[in-house]
Amino acid sequence: MSEPQKAAAPTSALDRYFKISERGSSIAAEFRGGLAAFFAMSYIVVLNPLVIGTGADASERTLGIAPVAAVTALVAGVMTILMGVIAKQPFAMAAGLGVNALLASTIATTPNLTWADIMGLVVLAGLIMTVLVLTGFRTAVFEAVPESLKTAIVVGIGFFISFIGLVDSGIIRRMPDAAGTTVPVSLGAGGHLLGWPTLVFLFGLFFTIALFIRNVKGAILWGVLASTALSLILEAVVPSGSVKESATGWSLNVPSLADMKFTTPNFSLIGSADLFGAFSHIGPLAASLLVFTILLSVFFDAMGVSVGLAAEAGTMKDGKVEDIDKVLLVDAFGSVIGGGASGSANQIFVESATGIGAGARTGFANIVTGVLFLLAIFISPLVTIVPFEAVAPALVVVGFLMIRQAVNIDWTDWGLGIPAFLTIIFMPLSYSIANGIGAGFVAYTFIRLVQGRGKEVHWLMYLVSAVFVIYFGMGIINGWTS
């Protein structure tokens, strides 16, 4: 966990408002952090349209690549700035990959459901979360979690973002089903590290580690910039192309210094969500179950990510995230606004840890990140120049920084150690923060009951554990109701 430096006296109104000096930071550090966070997150403007922009709904309508890209950048920019201004935390926001994958798969498998319908359900989930925050329920759940489980969430997120970095950079690859093997992943292509993009990742990883060891300020950002420069040179001299063309290609976008060009954004999706359409098209029960699924995923993702990021940024006091009620309120707005713009629920992005690793400690870094997202609406190369292989090393290094907190977990108490272990291991292996939290919560309440120490468990933990049991059993429930 990062320790804030000794606070200096505020030098301006901006400094006082964002608590820059109070948190031991500086304008320069916040700029570095904001830039690093944007570079780590900008891929979402490319990826989100591919996830939800191409699939046809029941009316044979697609959202479209260009409109989704426009609203993805717009809502990410607006919500990130709002989080910085209102909550004053360096927690950037964008369309959540878990939720958008859920929406895409639901559209593909549910007859009579349209994109307008399902985006309306996202808005409803956001409105329910807003009510839960305003009534204090969401914050109460947050505070009912034992400290060891909160620490386990931080460690689990550390493993998760490191795993994301390794997988999305191609160092660890998913094994194709046709391979006929029970091994789900392998090292590189066919068990070997191949290709220039892999070299960029390895260079970035060891260069960033070296900068950290030498205590260079902005090590994360310098690592991303140096890796990006190397990727541009390599692609110009020895083109690798996309991974779609070759197993040794770039994983998401091919780095290139294309001419800066201004594009006219397409905002036609804004306001197209149908709040109650799903209830008439697929029935009240099925629609309610979908709202519940979306709500639970977003609800606990935010809780876990905010704990992890605040612990790394040093913005926790007495085991609580500073201004957590404001953090959760803005996060709830992210689903309302994201769904209303048909860009999917916007959530606190775990890649914000990259910005924190580069020096971000306050909401001012969010202003930098948010403005860059808004510029990306009009200037296309902003989100295509940096390949994921240049950003992935930062995720791995920041993951290591978060994993170090495992020493603060009481592993000698089975009632804390086993739930902590399940929380940690479920996050990367199920590719879901919410799943890890749920596994830990259910195990915690169960083991405490077996130990005869059930009275030590907060009643909200019993309630939330019961909800997670229902959530994990949704497949069975859907089978009964279909």
Where are these regions (language model features)?
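Juxtamembrane transmembrane-helix boundary signature
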Residues: 2, 75-97, 128
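Helix-loop-helix hairpins and the membrane-proximal interhelical loops
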Residues: 2-66, 185-189, 224, 228-325, ...
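Helix-loop-helix junctions within the multi-pass membrane cores of secondary transporters/permeases
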Residues: 10-48, 75-76, 96-105, 109-154, ...
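Hydrophobic, aromatic-rich alpha-helical transmembrane segments
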Residues: 22-34, 61-69, 73, 114-118, ...
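Residue-level signature of catalytic and energy-coupling elements of molecular machines
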Residues: 31, 51, 141, 218, ...
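Hydrophobic/aromatic residues within the transmembrane alpha-helices of Major Facilitator Superfamily
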Residues: 35-42, 78, 85, 162, ...
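A generic, lipid-embedded transmembrane alpha helix
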Residues: 72-84, 104, 158-162
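Membrane-embedded alpha-helical modules
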Residues: 111-233, 367-482
